[in-house]
Amino acid sequence: MKFLLQQIRNMHVKPIKMRWLTGGVNYSYLLSTEDRRNSWLIDPAEPLEVSPKLSAEEKKSIDAIVNTHHHYDHSGGNLALYSILCQENSGHDIKIIGGSKSSPGVTEVPDNLQQYHLGNLRVTCIRTPCHTKDSICYYIKDLETGEQCIFTGDTLFIAGCGRFFEGTGRDMDMALNQIMLRAVGETNWNKVKIYPGHEYTKGNVSFIRAKIYSDIGQNKEFDALEQYCKSNECTTGHFTLRDELGYNPFMRLDDRAVRLAVGDTAGTYPRSVVMQELRKLKNAM
């Protein structure tokens, strides 16, 4: 099985590792236009780890600091990075965009489906409340090439999803399987590369193998993901929404194997209950 991948040519996405030595395995991202003159810095939680990994030219290009949600390991570096960027780029106007004023220094709170333009890049803000009420996924489309990606924070991980800190199973089902998928559109699912907030894939794969697809051959898409993880440390930017629909149990709530894993032998549980029980099962691992 070949995953549905496209190499991003005109837009540039630079993953920046944070908190890998302390177990957080976070990502910040620098999203830049083709000419690299305009950029967004997404979830720069750790200034001492992020700033040294940005060149002087990259710092000059940053128009906005952007948060997927307010948790400190995503927004905690807002003010320090803002200060650093303003000192190094006198007179450059830098916005801080987030889902609520709970993120430090936020100057703009976008509405659901509000759009921004960064050069040829169109950014659609998809509000996906559950992990936090202010969670936003940023869906990017290059209007020149058609290339696409999405920054999902702690809403969607490769082969998993975030905990329901400020929502319910129904909320996460709505966020993942209705709001996000509809906003992107079915014709784009195989084009949209996923950039999550954490590198949790290996743990998610272990959970799925232990609790859902226990046998090789039961889900070939999942088997291929498992093999990829054995030889690759990082999975961010390598998989699409269409890939996730093939193996992510939180996006496969009607799959008999998923329902059996949560005790729904008759296949009668509402989707919200399946989602809630699946999250409990994952939390217990």
Curated annotation (Swiss-Prot):
pH relationship of activity: Optimum pH is 6.5-9.
Catalytic activity line of the entry: an S-(2-hydroxyacyl)glutathione + H2O = a 2-hydroxy carboxylate + glutathione + H(+); (R)-S-lactoylglutathione + H2O = (R)-lactate + glutathione + H(+)
Superkingdom of the organism of origin: Eukaryota
Binding-site positions, Zn(2+) 2: D73, H74, D154, H198
Transit peptide: 1-10
Regulation: Inhibited by various thiol compounds such as glutathione and coenzyme A.
Subcellular location: Mitochondrion matrix
Cofactor(s) needed for function: Zn(2+)
Family: Belongs to the metallo-beta-lactamase superfamily. Glyoxalase II family.
Protein's recorded name: Hydroxyacylglutathione hydrolase, mitochondrial
Originating species: Saccharomyces cerevisiae (strain ATCC 204508 / S288c) (Baker's yeast)
The encoding gene: GLO4
